[in-house]
């Protein structure tokens, strides 16, 4: 299973973190054949952290993870 990990900085403002989660959901709706799962991860201030997200990838059986940095 190939996972796209959308990595953002994270914010103390919950609204900003929700925007990243929403973006990950929108990318997943495109049904890009290369990725079975799209999930967000955050550098700081929000969950899941990058490490937690990679652990989640292992739990769901990912065989490949592509990290897409999304920093503004």
Predicted ranges, named:
Residues 1-72:
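Active-site-proximal alpha-helix that buttresses catalytic centers in soluble enzyme cores
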């Amino acid at each position: 299973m190939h996972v796209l990990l959308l990595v953002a900085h994270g914010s103390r403002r919950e609204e900003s973190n929700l925007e990243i989660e929403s973006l990950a959901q929108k990318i997943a709706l495109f049904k890009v054949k290369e990725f079975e799962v799209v999930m967000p991860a955050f550098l700081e201030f929000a969950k899941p952290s990058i490490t937690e997200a990679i652990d989640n990838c292992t739990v769901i059986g990912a065989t490949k993870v592509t990290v897409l940095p999304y920093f503004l």
